[in-house]
Amino acid sequence: STGTGKHYDFIFTDDIITLDEPTTTPNIEVRPDDLFIMLYTSGSTGVPKGCMLEHRNILSFELSHTQICGINSDSRVTAYASYGFDASMMETYSAVVSGATLHIIAEEIRLDFVALNEYFIKHKITTSFMTTQVGFQFASACESPYLKALVVGGEKLAPIDPPKTFSLFNAYGPTECCVYTNIYKVAKYEDNIPIGKAVPNV
């Protein structure tokens, strides 16, 4: 029970291979207000809270995100965020709704900016998300002519000169609101970089 009067069955990913279930897709109806995922907050204000996001939440967000970053079927998007971080939905499902190619970044190159830059160039990556401090460093080191949008989020973005060849976005939003609610394109050097305005569909 979730305290909302609704009951949900949960399964852990480790248990999936032990299930004796058919491999065909079940014929079920999915409604906009059906539960899509439960994510836990960081617990910065106390005990982590489970946030129940519905199908309409993630679809509404992805329609905004793909528009902001210009993601389409020709795009090459990275899966950089860890699976338990809500930003991983932004990456994965932006590719699903747009038909973009999704590149899962290997653990061994995630903090190796030389290797990461080479990967971005070799695979013509167009869109990526990174946590703020990692993205701050990578934005200064990236030499890929293919990158169009780098979104950073998770903490305050330090002052930075805007990249010349791609757009740098500072995103903010609580887990409860499905990844980010506000976004700001860094277009000039500022001592205090704002979180910007609310995205469409908030």
Predicted regions and their residues:
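Motif- and composition-driven signal specific to adenylation
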Residues: 24-202
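ANL superfamily adenylate-forming
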Residues: 2-32, 150
